[in-house]
Amino acid sequence: PTYEMTYKKKEVIRPSHLGLELAKDKHASNGTNEQDLMDGFTVKDTQTATFDETWRPVWGETATIRNHYNELAVTLNQASMQRDIRIRFRVYDDGMGLRYEFPQQQKLNYIVVKEEHTQFAMTGDHTAYWIPGDYDTQEYETVISKMSEIRSKMKAAITSNASQTQFSPTGVQTSLQLKTDNGLYINLHEAACVNFPTMHLNLDDKNMVFESWLTPDATGMKGYVQTPFNTPWRTVIVSDDARDMLASNLILNLNEPCKIEDTSWIHPTKYCGVWWEMIAGGKQWSYTFDLPSVNLENLDYSKCRPHGQHPANTENVKRYIDFAAKNGLQEVLVEGWNIGWEDWFGHYKDYVFDFQTPYPDFDIKYLNDYAHSKGVKLMMHHETSGSTQNYERHLEAAYSLMNKYGYDAVKSGYVGDIIPRGDYHYSQSTNNHYLYCIKEAAKHHIMVNAHEATRPTGLCRTWPNLVGNESARGTEYEAFGGSEPYHTVILPFTRLQGGPMDYTPGIFVTKLSEWCDNKSYVHTTLCGQLALYLTMYSPLQMAAD
């Protein structure tokens, strides 16, 4: 099957192929007799529909959002395998989405996806605003170049990160923003990525064709699917006015309505916290230098000598609480409150944290009581060190602890390579982990701000307790040499298409030497930092320093 797309009589997508390559795998219903879902189809049925609604987001930039589209659902029969698939298109004034649908059938019950081959054939050598394709990180600076220059600029675009896995010299990530010579703005992304890997794009730079490239898991396969099943939407937003790209709600509209019945506990939040003084290099997340390694099952921190550089302590956190109360901030984040930070990173270690036990100098009950007496709440911090399986083992107890002391929001982190070992940050299984945490948090009336997780695809409509994601190069990099001045004015067109970003602005002390021995300067002005609160929309905003 193929499709093409025009906008105001201008060609946007040239005829482009659709389909999925399936593995001849013993876990599939058809085993080694499996055939690809690429060709050999005949049209069995077509159905059209029009839909128009106005819905109210729990939070957002507007009080209401209109969801108005025309729909075409094409059922295709693959006679050689005696099975049907459906490709559904939804067309909006500002773009379209398409997805593959697999009704349950005898010959289409369990399938193993080897690769998806959804193409986006461009009409020319457009200007692209891109970051390197990577299975583990989105924390790259945006490169502005012609599509034909991606290959030559890729090596320089790849900068060091705690966990990174590139896959192609012309592979890029979505949301990908493009600008044509004839005045069109085009954005390629995905919506409603549920139980499926994150999609990247690989460029055939001879023919100017982008093709989907899914994130594998540790087995090398891309997805294990039980029908009935729908893939995420593959989206194209288009306009001849750049401002329309920022106003588009296409990604949100392609997601399911809110699944949380009572949303009264979900609220916008301004916060400060114990974070920047560690990022800038002056203080430590850890409590002691006595330990060459940590075994949480057999360790008494009360016998360790504190190194005196641990800001997540009772007296210092009280200062932040007082500041928040005085300045109208609702919450105070405290990183480094819990035991285990002495060897938390870089060892592929499974049991790094228990997410429940504070260091000796952090009085969790007293500080929460003190904060509540001031009309402020503490914000929880759960760094996983990439061990999703350890986090899931402790998740119920960790969320219950939050309920016990009155926390209503958590900042989670996934720094480092993913455990189970060999998996990636954006695989099907890891994406399922992120959503599992969000769903479990909703049961406990907890809002989630996930850092180092997969880039958002509009799931905050369905699960509005997902109030923030990082999923891009944020303010912390200003302590590591900084970002290009244009970085923050491109992100709204790229990263923010799928949902808000916890960019953590609010750096007013721009000479880092005032914090520590760091000789870097924050590449900003006071006015620029204040402007970020408007241009980088999020219901969750930090006053970082």
Please give the residue ranges for each predicted region:
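Glycine-rich, aromatic-lined ligand/substrate-binding cores of catalytic
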Residues: 511-545
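Aromatic- and carboxylate-enriched substrate-binding clefts and catalytic-loop regions
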Residues: 335-521, 525
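N-terminal accessory beta-strand-rich subdomains and adjacent acidic, glycine-rich linkers
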Residues: 1-261
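Short amphipathic alpha-helical segments and helix-helix/interface helices
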Residues: 117, 164, 173-175, 321, ...
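Short, flexible loop/turn elements at secondary-structure junctions
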Residues: 78-80, 91-93, 124, 239, ...
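An acidic-aromatic substrate-binding cleft motif
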Residues: 226-327, 331
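Short acidic/polar active-site loop segments enriched in Thr and Asp
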Residues: 330, 408, 541
